[in-house]
């Protein structure tokens, strides 16, 4: 078994939810965001008679997951696809007993992908989770979008109140040369920011906005939600881990809109990481877990 870069968040809380519905016969666990396989490996190690369907849009990280989960050969089915595409194009042989979607970006992408996800690394701006599929990269966006389009993007998907100042600096820089790397963009943003105390890096919100836009993350989430609940078995659970308010609001409102006769919300308030987990795993600090249970089909 190989090593992984990413520590799965809220793992104990996911296991606690699984305990509610686990049955020792034909249990199907769907990991919509397999990553390196952290959540799935823990589930497979704890429960002997369980089948995992692992969905991952990045073929490179999917191969890492296959190496990490090699000891569970025969218990995991792998699919290289976006989770919304998978559920719209494939039919499960049986309804799922548990569906998990961890919407965070893997530490592998920040540390090892070389695609410019992190402003601490000096990498070519890309941010596509599946670059082989084509589509606009972050490089294309920051070098070709006009003023209004860039301002709207950074404000809408990043909640960045200094979007106009940032875009003004980007456009000035573009007059001289193209913005090629994540470190380059981070420097432009930092210089545009007012000199105020911040809890986060000035580039955080802009990088989030670019990544969300490049990968169409919010659209994919909205598209997936009805597909996920439709794929649950009777008494099945859908658990979703979000990492920013835009995602969390979408999930919260969708859950509230479901029939109270058919679905039971298991998290009246989102579950957050414990003090100890936050201390040991910085990635868990902004994580929120919401879950529902399907009472009948």
UniProtKB/Swiss-Prot annotation:
What's the Enzyme Commission number for this chain? 2.1.1.199
Q: What is its main location?
A: cytoplasm
Localization per record: Cytoplasm
Reactions catalysed, semicolon-separated, are: cytidine(1402) in 16S rRNA + S-adenosyl-L-methionine = N(4)-methylcytidine(1402) in 16S rRNA + S-adenosyl-L-homocysteine + H(+)
Keywords for this entry? Answer: Cytoplasm, Methyltransferase, rRNA processing, S-adenosyl-L-methionine, Transferase
Entry's Gene Ontology cellular component terms: cytoplasm
Protein name in the entry:
Ribosomal RNA small subunit methyltransferase H
């Amino acid at each position: 078994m190989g090593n992984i870069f990413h520590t799965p968040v809220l793992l104990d809380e996911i296991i606690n939810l699984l305990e509610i519905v686990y049955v020792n016969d034909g249990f199907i666990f769907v990991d919509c965001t397999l990553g390196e396989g952290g959540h799935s490996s823990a589930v497979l190690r704890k429960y002997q008679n369980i089948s995992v369907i692992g969905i991952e849009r990045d073929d490179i990280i999917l191969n890492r997951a296959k190496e990490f989960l090699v000891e569970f050969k025969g218990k995991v089915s792998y699919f290289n696809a976006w989770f919304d595409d998978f559920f719209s194009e494939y039919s499960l042989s049986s309804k799922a007993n548990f569906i998990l979607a961890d919407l965070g970006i893997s530490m592998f992408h920040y540390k090892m992908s070389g695609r410019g996800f992190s402003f601490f690394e000096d990498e070519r701006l890309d941010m596509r989770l599946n670059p082989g599929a084509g589509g606009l990269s972050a490089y294309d966006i920051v070098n070709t979008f006009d003023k209004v389009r860039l301002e709207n993007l950074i404000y809408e998907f990043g909640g960045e109140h200094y979007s106009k100042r940032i875009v003004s600096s980007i456009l000035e820089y573009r007059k001289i040369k193209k913005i090629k790397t994540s470190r380059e963009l981070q420097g432009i943003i930092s210089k545009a920011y007012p000199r105020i105390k911040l809890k986060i890096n000035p580039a955080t919100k802009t990088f989030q906005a670019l990544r969300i836009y490049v990968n169409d993350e919010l659209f994919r989430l909205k598209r997936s939600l009805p597909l996920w609940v439709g794929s649950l078995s009777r008494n099945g659970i859908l658990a979703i881990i979000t990492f920013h308010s835009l995602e969390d609001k979408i999930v919260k409102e969708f859950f509230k809109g479901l029939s109270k006769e058919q679905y039971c919300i298991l998290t009246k308030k989102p579950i957050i990481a414990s003090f100890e987990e936050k201390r040991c795993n910085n990635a868990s600090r902004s994580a929120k877990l919401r879950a529902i249970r399907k009472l009948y089909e």
